[in-house]
Amino acid sequence: MKRYSIIRSFCVLVTLSWCMISCDGFLKESPRDALPEEEGYRNITELYLNAVASLYNYIGGNSDSQGLQGTGRGIYDLNTFTTDEAIMPTRGGDWYDGGFWQGLFLHKWGINNDAIQATWEYLYKVVMLSNKSLEQIESYALTHADAELPAYRAEVRALRAMYYYYLTDLFGSIPLVLSSKVASKDIVLSERENIFNFIFKELQETAPLLPAQFSNRSGNYYGRLTRPVAYFLLAKLALNAEIYMDNNWVDDIHPNGKTIFFDVDGNTFNAWQTVEFYCDQITALGYRLESDYAANFAVYNEGSVENIFTIPMNKTLYTNQMQYLFRSRHYNHAKALGLSGENGSSATIEALQTFGYETNEQDPRFD
């Protein structure tokens, strides 16, 4: 009886041990559609696709607060309906939306504004993905010396700088995060001037390494951040340097563009001279104003010599959306054209008057 008990106990122990080993093996997942991260960067082509090209998936969007432009309740709306440029009036029961649009125009948004939070999260998501991409490029560079590496590194740095431009433009002083591994407790706020200087320096250093190609034309550089795009961002930064370098908006001391100086191509220029310099660089690359302003907004506008950075909108190739056109059409106008309309956004009277609306100097484009 005792011998039987020992044998039975031993059998139970062996069975339990086998079950534990079997369960452990069973819980190890090996999905057929998964790829180990390190296998996504085995050569320079894979590195470009997964560390550089993948970031452009986020330039446009198809849902609220996603993409740099095209969708609702994101960067465009926060930059437009908070100014005298445009308004989203409440008509009947349309466009009240809990007072959201009125809050933007009247500057009465609160800390619980979902659109503002979602836009912040979108922008920082791409910043962190860019940080991760730069880390992957540096890791690859430890064992490879491909000639494309400096250009790929520069493209990601410039892309990250552009996202920081949108962040500081919307939010002022923000955290400057340059690693994907930084702990939340170590993230601190940086003054707006520091953010500005970082962006400006990144774009100055990366611009010479970027291809001097038209980003708005079909081909290998379509929709990418090329040298003209970097120059344009530098011009915009210098143009608004008085704002972006002001850390205290409530005092009576503000920077003056004539006394803000930059080291530009071996020269010392003030802010306004810097704007002129980078605009001249853009012109030298073949850009100019279109004789027909509307040509920039044609369906097939890839031949534009004025558009500098565009978001690809081909419906058969991309999911990016452009909602602003149908959002502004009156219902009846849209119906007459066989299109959709939402009777939404409108220009303000102040914006129209800037172009001489209903005066003898009225802009001929109103005709």
Q: Predicted regions span which residues?
A:
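Hydrophobic helical h-region of N-terminal Sec-dependent signal peptides
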Residues: 12-16
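Short linear capping/connector segments at secondary-structure termini
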Residues: 33-36, 178-184
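Short, small-residue-rich loop/turn micro-motifs
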Residues: 172, 178-180, 203, 241-243
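Bacterial N-terminal signal peptides that target proteins for export
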Residues: 2-11
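An aromatic- and glycine-enriched ligand-binding surface/loop that stacks and positions planar moieties
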Residues: 24-101, 174, 209, 224-367
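A general, composition-driven signal for non-globular sequence regions
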Residues: 2, 151-154, 321
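C-terminal motif of bacterial Sec signal peptides marking the signal peptidase cleavage site
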Residues: 20-22
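Conserved, well-structured interaction surfaces
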Residues: 45-68, 89-171, 183-219
